[in-house]
């Protein structure tokens, strides 16, 4: 595999990972905050 033209796959993968990880962290943080506020 050449080092040329691996950037689209890398970019799509990076965007997919961060696009899923950031809302997941925000979602877990909001859930923990709601449970902490309810008690």
UniProtKB/Swiss-Prot annotation:
It is a single-pass membrane protein. Its main location: plastid. Its cofactor is heme b. The keyword Transport applies. With its partner (PsbE) binds heme. PSII binds additional chlorophylls, carotenoids and specific lipids. It is found in: Plastid membrane. Coiled coil: none annotated. GO terms for molecular function: electron transfer activity; heme binding; iron ion binding. The chain crosses the membrane at residues 14-30. Heme binds at residue 18. It comes from the Eukaryota. SUPFAM superfamilies: Cytochrome b559 subunits. Belongs to the PsbE/PsbF family. Heterodimer of an alpha subunit and a beta subunit. PSII is composed of 1 copy each of membrane proteins PsbA, PsbB, PsbC, PsbD, PsbE, PsbF, PsbH, PsbI, PsbJ, PsbK, PsbL, PsbM, PsbT, PsbX, PsbY, PsbZ, Psb30/Ycf12, at least 3 peripheral proteins of the oxygen-evolving complex and a large number of cofactors. It forms dimeric complexes. This b-type cytochrome is tightly associated with the reaction center of photosystem II (PSII). PSII is a light-driven water:plastoquinone oxidoreductase that uses light energy to abstract electrons from H(2)O, generating O(2) and a proton gradient subsequently used for ATP formation. It consists of a core antenna complex that captures photons, and an electron transfer chain that converts photonic excitation into a charge separation. This is Cytochrome b559 subunit beta. It comes from Cuscuta gronovii (Common dodder). The lineage of its organism: Eukaryota, Viridiplantae, Streptophyta, Embryophyta, Tracheophyta.
């Amino acid at each position: 595999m050449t080092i040329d033209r691996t950037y689209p796959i890398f970019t799509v993968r990076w965007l997919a990972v961060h696009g899923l990880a950031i809302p997941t962290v925000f979602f877990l943080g909001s859930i923990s905050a709601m449970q902490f506020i309810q008690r």
